[in-house]
Amino acid sequence: MLSSKEISTSRMGKEAVIETTMNEALIRLIRSLSASFSNQEQAFENPPLYGNILVRLRPLPQLDPGSLLLEQAYAIASNEPYRVRVLQPTVCPTRGLLILNYAIRDDQRFWGSVEDPQRRSQLTAADLTLLEGCSYQVRETDEGFRGEVEPGCRCLVTRRGKTSYLVSSFELTDDGMSTIDRGYDPATHEHLWGSIAGPFQFKRTDDHSAEIPHHWVTDLKNTGGTVLGNGEDR
């Protein structure tokens, strides 16, 4: 029979293995997200149903490890993104892999900076506001990663002057990414906007993972991503 000390040591060993595995998954997620994507092929095949959209994410070395600038824009107006965010993959001890979702104050200042390192470097933690209820819960799969906006109908967005809650999911692989976003009425749960023809299918066009600073990898291995959040202890 094992002594209490042996049981405690065994438990600590298992927890260390789980933490190491989660840290490695976090680093893989950050690397996989650090890329540019386009659904050009899908848009050209189905022009009535899908616009040609660019999704571009690049590391922000001046912010906490994992922080990525996201710009989402129509290809015909690539420097006028309709969505600008900072995403930060991290690990929560009780919830596993998460992607925190930040709004940027006066985000128009940074339009197009995904392709402009100098302007990108001016983004600071003071410019960010965490969007409560809009984090993505992520799990690793055989093909890559799958994520969904956390449950609770708390991720509120406004489109055309009407408030809705967001239901969003994605699948990320070596080849690309599929996403689906839909908005629902908070009172009636009626579907208000979003794809009715199925997910957007994006192909990976550029890899930006070489821009990930080495100290991020070191810090994430040491902390497990649990004390991150651009100034917040999460």
Feature roles, as predicted:
Residues I18-E80:
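Short N-terminal edge-element motif at the start of the domain
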Residues L2, E6, N23-S36, Q40-Q42, ...:
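Calycin-type beta-barrel ligand-binding domains and close structural analogs
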Residues M1-A16:
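N-terminal amphipathic/basic-hydrophobic helices that include classical n-h-c signal peptides
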